[in-house]
């Protein structure tokens, strides 16, 4: 994290979209494996493209602050220690989302077995 980013955090100033976009892609490059990076880069590019013409200030603040938290988590590697056993979250999912989560879990397990 450079000095400007630290100063912006101290003053609770949001990072402008383009530097934030670059920061997230850089974090992917340094902290993710090749497959995760490819998937993450594709998702980040699509999300920033979708939000390019958003004019609602509240939506922009939410969008940028969420991506800043994501970049912070990647850079601090705090995401590796997190455990996702939140039963409230699981209970809030609908049947389709639970099915998708199950399929994703199965695919990840199969991928680990093949490595």
From Swiss-Prot:
Disulphide linkage map: none
Subcellular location field: Mitochondrion matrix
Principal location: mitochondrion
UniProt keywords, alphabetically: Chaperone, Mitochondrion, Transit peptide
GO CC aspect terms: mitochondrial intermembrane space; mitochondrial matrix; mitochondrion
GO BP term (any one): succinate metabolic process
Pfam families attached to this UniProt entry: Complex1_LYR_2 (PF13233)
Segment forming the signal sequence: none
Family of the protein in this entry: Belongs to the complex I LYR family. SDHAF3 subfamily.
Subunit structure: Interacts with sdh2 within an sdh1-sdh2 subcomplex.
The protein's role, per its UniProt record: Plays an essential role in the assembly of succinate dehydrogenase (SDH), an enzyme complex (also referred to as respiratory complex II) that is a component of both the tricarboxylic acid (TCA) cycle and the mitochondrial electron transport chain, and which couples the oxidation of succinate to fumarate with the reduction of ubiquinone (coenzyme Q) to ubiquinol. Promotes maturation of the iron-sulfur protein subunit sdh2 of the SDH catalytic dimer, protecting it from the deleterious effects of oxidants. May act together with SDHAF1.
Protein name per UniProt: Succinate dehydrogenase assembly factor 3, mitochondrial
Organism of derivation: Schizosaccharomyces pombe (strain 972 / ATCC 24843) (Fission yeast)
């Amino acid at each position: 994290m450079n000095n400007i980013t630290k100063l912006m955090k101290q003053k609770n100033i949001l990072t402008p979209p383009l530097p934030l976009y670059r920061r997230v892609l850089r974090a992917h490059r340094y902290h993710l494996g090749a497959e995760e990076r490819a998937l993450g880069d594709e998702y980040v590019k699509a999300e920033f493209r979708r939000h390019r013409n958003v004019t609602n200030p509240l939506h922009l603040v939410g969008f940028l602050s969420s991506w800043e938290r994501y970049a912070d988590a990647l850079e601090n590697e705090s995401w590796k220690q997190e455990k996702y056993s939140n039963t409230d979250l699981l209970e809030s999912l609908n049947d389709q989302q639970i099915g998708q989560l199950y399929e994703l879990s199965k695919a990840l397990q199969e991928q680990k077995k093949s490595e």
